[in-house]
A protein has these predicted regions:
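Alpha-helical interface subdomain recognition
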Residues: 1-89, 101-106, 113, 117-118, ...
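Short Ser/Thr-interspersed hydrophobic loop/turn segments at strand-loop and sheet-helix junctions
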Residues: 49, 73-77, 170, 186-191, ...
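Short Gly/Pro-enriched turn/cap motifs at secondary-structure boundaries
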Residues: 114, 129-132, 156-159, 173-175, ...
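Flexible, small-/acidic-enriched active-site or ligand-binding loops
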Residues: 136, 191-220
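Long, acidic (Asp/Glu-rich), low-complexity accessory segments flanking structured domains
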Residues: 216-233
């Protein structure tokens, strides 16, 4: 693995950093308070190529590598973890899945507007009774000849209320277990497709999380992704890459909290000196810096392996497992270093602490990552 970033990668990192400072930081506290989706900012992210970063330019993407994606995600998440998850889902779950597995016709129709940021997408796998146990899908898509008839409920869908296109995983033949699952592209506005109320969340409150209700929705045959029965393998393959996105989001949350804590520790005085001169504080910062660097290396490793076409189930899971733990630990300590100030909203660290928790839950809980890693190393 080459640790020297190229000129182009450094430029992308700087562009994302500038964008986050200038466009995401203003209003981030209010968007968190009001659960307000960053509509204008996401539009600009699309114009900058941040919503289809790794997609071939012939399908509207920016044609960049996955390390650039990690760098940009970290910068965006440092300032606004909600905008970062919108970016992660659109890039890694929706665009990457379509680019790799969709038909040419589907790519032209759906991938191009999604990768160029004209619209955003969502990925609907989780259900009220099927989160970690993803093969237990209750949503059904019955083969009716010319079309499939979709019925069921999806839960906790990121971009659920703002997406135009949804990748929906559903059971087509329960007898066949995971080989009887398919993935479909469903358009917002189709008859029988209803979007449930917005979830009132602990963190990433600027992102838009809804349940989706399908009541006899007709899906044209041409909107199935891949061969019949490919849906579960599709979801697993897509989630492997998605975990790099969430690991990078977690990395950004951690490094954002660390930078704020370091700055504070260098200026805040207690017992006649800046608090960084107290070993109790300095050692916390030393641990944070070490863990963040290790998390970044795991993200780079998984991203480099992805671009080399290697199996990233293990490296993606390791990056997500570790970076999300670092996000949680670092943000808790950042609040602690800030003392009473850390507990109020204007210092940002309490928001980052709330935002961190979800990175241990979505796109596979930490426990699921350990299943993936342990099965891989046992092979
Ligand atoms: N990569 C590629 N393929 C995989 C895989 C992986 N990481 N894990 C499993 N598979 C494949 C297996 O090879 C097998 O395929 P074949 O039969 O063709 O060989 C098939 O999937 C079934 O595998 P298992 O028998 O191992 O399946 P299982 O029932 O034991 O479950 C699991 C495996 C890893 C636990 C899986 O269910 C899982 O990953 N669960 C977590 C789901 C998840 O991440 N949900 C998050 C929701 S999406 C979200 O959060 C989005 C958002 O909005 C932010």
């Amino acid at each position: 693995m080459d640790f020297n970033l190229s000129e182009e990668q450094l430029m992308i990192q700087q562009a994302a950093r500038d964008f986050a400072q200038n466009e995401l930081l203003p209003g981030v506290i209010e968007r968190d308070r009001d659960q307000k989706f960053p509509t204008e900012q996401v539009k600009k992210m699309g114009e900058m190529g941040l919503l289809g970063m790794m997609v071939d330019p012939k399908y509207g993407g920016a044609g960049m590598d996955s390390v650039s994606y990690v760098l940009a995600m970290e910068e965006i998440a440092k300032i606004d973890a909600s905008a970062a998850v919108v970016m992660s889902v659109n890039n890694s779950l929706v665009c990457a899945g379509l680019e790799k597995f969709a038909s040419e016709e589907q790519k032209v129709k759906y991938l191009t507007p999604l990768a160029s940021g004209q619209v955003i997408g969502a990925f609907a796998l989780s259900e009220p009774e099927a989160g970690s146990d993803a093969t237990s899908q209750k949503t059904t898509a019955e083969d009716k000849g010319d079309y499939y008839l979709l019925n069921g409920i999806k839960n906790w869908i990121t971009n659920g209320g703002t997406a135009s296109y949804y990748i929906v995983i559903a059971q087509t033949d329960p007898e066949k277990k995971h080989k009887g699952i398919n993935a479909f592209i469903v358009e917002r506005g189709w008859e029988g497709f209803e979007i449930g109320p917005k979830e009132d969340k602990l963190g990433i409150r600027g992102s838009d999380t809804h349940s989706l209700i399908f009541n006899n929705v007709k899906i044209p045959k041409g909107n199935r992704i891949g061969e019949d029965g490919f849906g579960f393998n599709f979801a697993m393959a897509v989630l492997n890459g998605g975990r790099i996105g969430i690991a990078s989001q977690a990395l950004g949350i951690a490094s954002g909290a660390y930078e704020l804590a370091l700055k504070y520790a260098k200026t805040r005085k207690a017992f006649k000196t800046e608090i960084i001169n107290h070993q109790a504080i300095a050692f916390k910062l030393a641990d944070m810096a070490t863990q963040i660097t290790a998390a970044r290396m795991l993200c780079f490793k998984a991203a480099t392996e992805k671009d080399a076409g290697k199996d990233i189930s293990e490296s993606g899971a390791m990056a997500k497992l570790y970076a999300s733990q670092v996000a949680m630990d670092t943000t808790i300590e950042a609040v602690q270093i800030h003392g009473g100030y850390g507990y109020v909203k204007e210092y940002h660290v309490e928001r980052l602490m709330r935002d961190a928790k979800i990175t241990q839950i979505y796109e596979g809980t930490s426990e699921i990552q350990k299943i993936v890693i342990s099965r891989s190393i046992a092979k």
